Amino acid sequence: MPQLWQGRASKAVDSRVNDFNSSIRFDARMIEQDIQGSLVHSAMLGRQGIISQQDVDDIHKGLHSILDDLHSGALEIDPNAEDVHTFVEQTLTARVGDAGKRLHTGRSRNDQVALDIRLNLRAASEHIQGQIKELITVLCDQAEKGAGYVMPGYTHLQRAQPVTFGHQLMAYAWMLLRDLGRLQDATRRMDAECPLGSGALAGTTYPLDRFYTAEQLGFAAPCGNSIDGVSDRDFCIELCSAMATCMMHLSRLSEEIILWCSWEFKFIELDDAFTTGSSIMPQKKNPDVTELIRGKTGRVYGDLNTLLVMMKGIPLAYDKDMQEDKEAIFDAVDTLELCLRTVTPMLATMTPLPANMRRAAAKGFINATDCADYLTKKGMPFRDAYKCTGTMVAACIREGKTLEELTLDEFKQYSDLFAEDVYTAIDLTTCCEGRTSYGGPTKASVLRQVSEVKGKLA
């Protein structure tokens, strides 16, 4: 397939350069968006009297026929085409003749590709947002069921204070809600400015109606500067950053799932459909889904780094370096979509094991803070109460006891403020339900969080 730009060249381009220069293998996924932009651009050319209405009709008929063939599977994309724009234009011209040659009037591939990427990422962002909402809903449903399942909360991966399974899961729901907001914000900024009509960099001499094309394509307005219009890839970086942050949250959740389903914790059981086995160890039930999410997170970080490094030193306006944006951003999109598609049903089908959680919570003195708070509420300064409780814990460790196993006389050896009600104060359920501060682990708080988060998804 010949290049669109061969008018000046005195020699045919070396085949190795053609192979090196071609982007059709990764930008062909934008073919629907390329056609969408061309339909609107050609309609505008007709409205402005730049091309005839007959040309517009022929162009639209040809573009729709390409779309029909694409959807039916009959369209064969030429792997030798330089890029998706070349393929569409030359396929169109082969079908409708000279009208196809008029499509590119007042347009450059520079503003064309800047538009296509935006349209493609808009659709991708909307799809990912829907996936995140589904995952948040699953987390909320599991949290609602586990709102009363007491488990250890951890700092430094050491047992720290009692929380509930529902409270822990809702932490991830809130993280993902922020991810949803970041994607929405980035998409809103991307949709604020339409680059179509910027030309190669300096606009055009044709009387284009850029406000018409911007409106028809779902943008708030045309971009205010034609050089910025073709040079901008901020939207790729911002969306990729939002996706990388989401992957980070999925990776943290995955790490906890990996721990929780191990025999060392056994807080949950993953459905067999979402685990794998070993070729040599018959007892194994491996959480491969979560391990792959953890690994793929680094891949999306790499995509973001690629975009940042690619853009950091190139002068205005368009440079061929920018062709490398698509593989990075599309890989980030595909990776996040794949992870979300897999992790959501995995979490929906996991089985919590509350008895194991409770047994783990009974170890490690995670009610020590509550013991110190008990003394503080009896009038002892908190720092003294902290020291007193620490001394008690050290003694219990030496003697192989828990705080609950101390007699009242033993408690009183450390402070006369202890009374019979200390046993209620350090009961694990009481510890959770007593933390009534907003956002805490009480059952009522978890259920309120579930309701609030689900309300934000509506």
Residue ranges and their predicted role:
Residues 117, 122, 129, 144, ...:
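Charged, flexible cofactor/metal-binding loops and thiol motifs
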Residues 38, 85, 89, 236-239, ...:
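Short runs of predominantly hydrophobic/aromatic residues within well-ordered alpha helices
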Residues 41, 62-69, 91, 95, ...:
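Generic, well-ordered alpha-helical scaffold segments in large soluble proteins
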Residues 1-189, 193, 199, 203, ...:
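A helix-coil-helix interface module used to build multimeric assemblies
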Residues 1-37, 98-99, 281-458:
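Glycine-rich cofactor/substrate-binding loops
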Residues 40-43, 119, 123, 237-241, ...:
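Positions in alpha-helical segments
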